[in-house]
């Protein structure tokens, strides 16, 4: 009897599926936009280029006041003591590509060696650090979500070599009363290696104390940190999502 019922149900399922058409599960609601991928390290056709070399700082300003004061040529280099820089344009959800390198001459150790940071929305730091044969606390090494999430692996290249971060960021959402509706999430690929896999960001990345979730606008500038080390950047572009 049980075998008969099973066969009956199976035959019914077959007839149900057999009577359907493949077109019923085809989705024609949104045609994907055609985008031309960049060749090599060039940005894709729909990217906003934030720094492409040739001393172009038009899209940046100081995070203190006035114009950005970093050295700008084919690459963009931190000038210690001048403060960080931030984009004039604001971003929320985004795909970010950025290349960086620590100085080839090794000075210092731990957090004092090739230190900078990529601050998403100016609040959530993906750590930049020379972590090649350089021990420090693990949630503060290169590719960490600073003081929150240890990278899956250490994919750092030797000092002086160009490195890449490809970052997918989903901004947090706040309710009208200022409470957090949904956290920020981030995925980070370092030199082609996945090191943060859709990680929840618990709030602002603080040097001292726990993360905070103070409400803020849906879009804010991207910021690069002056931590006193001459770290260089190039080929910075973003795709708002």
Stretch-by-stretch model annotation:
Residues 19-241:
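Carbohydrate-interacting regions of secretory-pathway proteins
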